Amino acid sequence: CADKAYKHVYVTEGRIEFGCENADSFELARQMQKEMAYLSDRDKKQTVLVLNLANPVHPGGGVRRGARAQEEDLCRKSSLLLSLESSAARKYYDYNSSLHTYFGSDALMITPQVEIIRDEKGNLLQDSVIVSVMSCAAPMLCNGLEGITDAQYRDMMFGRITGMLKTAAYLGYQVLVLGAFGCGAFRNDAHIVSDIF
C-alpha cells in the first residue's frame, strides 16, 4: 500500500474478513488486541498473531547492527529478540543455514507470548500488550531465482504461505496481522505475494 495509492479496504467473505492497512504491524496488533477485549470471555484469551518477516539464518536479522527492516523493528519494540536468540530457536536457523540456498525453508516458529513495550515511534508504552508472533522467512531473491522457473517459485511461495495460514488455524488463531512477505529487501514481487495470500 503506497501512501498515495492507499485505500482502506476490508472484505468479508463468509466468516473471513480481511483488509489492507498501511500500518505498523505491532500498532495494528495492539489496536486489534484492544478491540478483542470487547468480545466474549471465551475469545478474550485469544491473542493476535503477528507475522515476523524473518531472516532465515540470522536471529533478528540485522537488529544488532542497526538495520531497519520489519523484523528488526519488531525486535526493537518488544521481547521478540529474546525468543529468536534462544537455544530452542537455534534449530530453525541451523536448519535454514544447512540448505545452502537463499530460498530458506517452509520452517516457521511461533512465539506465543511477545510483550510489545514500544509504540511505532519508539516511545515506551504505558501499558504493554501481549501478542503471539509467527516467524517465517520468504525466499531471498537478491540473486534471482537461482535456476528455478517462475512456476516453481510460485509453488514454493504458495506452499510457504499456505503453511503459515494452516499453522495459525491449527493453533486456533483467529486474528492475524500479516505483512508484505518478502517484498522489501528480499525482493519478492508484491503482486505475486498478494495474489497468493
Where are these regions (language model features)?
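Macrodomain-like recognition of ADP-ribose-binding/processing modules
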Residues: 1-197
